[in-house]
Amino acid sequence: MSAQKPGLHPRNRHQHRYDLAALCQTTPELTSFLIRTPAGEQSVDFANPQAVKALNKALLAHFYAVTHWDIPPGFLCPPVPGRADYIHHLADLLGETTGSIPAQATILDVGVGANCIYPLIGVHEYGWRFTGSEVSDAAMSSAQAIIQANTGLSRAIRLRRQKDPAAIFTGIIHKNEFYDATLCNPPFHDSAAAARAGSERKRRNLGQNKDDALNFGGQQQELWCEGGEVAFIKKMIAESQTFRRQVLWFTTLVSRGENLPPLYRALTEAGAVKVVKKEMAQGQKQSRFIAWTFMGDDQRRRFITRKR
């Protein structure tokens, strides 16, 4: 039960295989979703979306003190270890300027989602304060319900509705507001058909019947946008220029390595002073995020000093 997962960040709490007994003690409903693998080991029925949701609920309660968490049907149920990795690598990036991870960082989560996952982890692990933007009323209501149901979160997490679905930072970052970083898990498909095909592949890989009533979810704004991930991030890069003095680091996940070259070109054209790529791995899954800033070393130090 102690096999280490390759590639996770050293501070990630999910280095080892899940202690299912402990998780079931924290969240008893998980017990009904346990199965035996062909090798005879106890596991979670990952082909069942309700089981995945129960596992997430248990992980968030056990490791992050989130006692009440739920999402409506049809929304993305995020893998907690991978989301935690982004937060920990972002903490390392923020710590590079001064040599220590900031305890009072303010973070903007672009597309906070119904699950509110990044703020939940970031508040618990580092005491950061989050603003979460969202275009979907249903997702925003879900995230707000999670915040209100857990003591102390309303002081650390605030949500803002993005009224213009074509905008990313505009309308969310207010005048005289400053952020240490933005983060984002962008939509990666370029059409609804591509998103459906991706969901079908995931179901087949997990042995789930196509006609199952439940699937792994994902609303339009979570899964696809015109032009796909590259177009979305290029839009983000273009908009980031307007807020170049209000944000220290802009960051976003990039799902595929082949998407990086056009993004690097866009960053050069936008005048980014420094661009960083952070590679991550969760088991067999490789992922990465890119970060860019319009501030030089001295400017970044002054920004941090002034903001503190």
UniProtKB/Swiss-Prot annotation:
Cellular component per GO? cytoplasm
What GO biological process terms are annotated to this protein in UniProt?
A: rRNA base methylation
User: InterPro entries given for it?
Assistant: METTL16/RlmF, rRNA_lsu_MeTfrase_F, SAM-dependent_MTases_sf
- State the reactions this protein catalyses: adenosine(1618) in 23S rRNA + S-adenosyl-L-methionine = N(6)-methyladenosine(1618) in 23S rRNA + S-adenosyl-L-homocysteine + H(+)
- GO MF: 23S rRNA (adenine(1618)-N(6))-methyltransferase activity
This protein's record includes keyword Transferase? yes
Q: What class of enzyme is it?
A: transferase
Q: Belongs to which family?
A: Belongs to the methyltransferase superfamily. METTL16/RlmF family.
Q: Report the function annotation for this chain.
A: Specifically methylates the adenine in position 1618 of 23S rRNA.
Question: Per its record, how is this protein called by name?
Answer: Ribosomal RNA large subunit methyltransferase F
Q: Organism source for this protein?
A: Salmonella paratyphi B (strain ATCC BAA-1250 / SPB7)
Q: Which gene encodes it?
A: rlmF
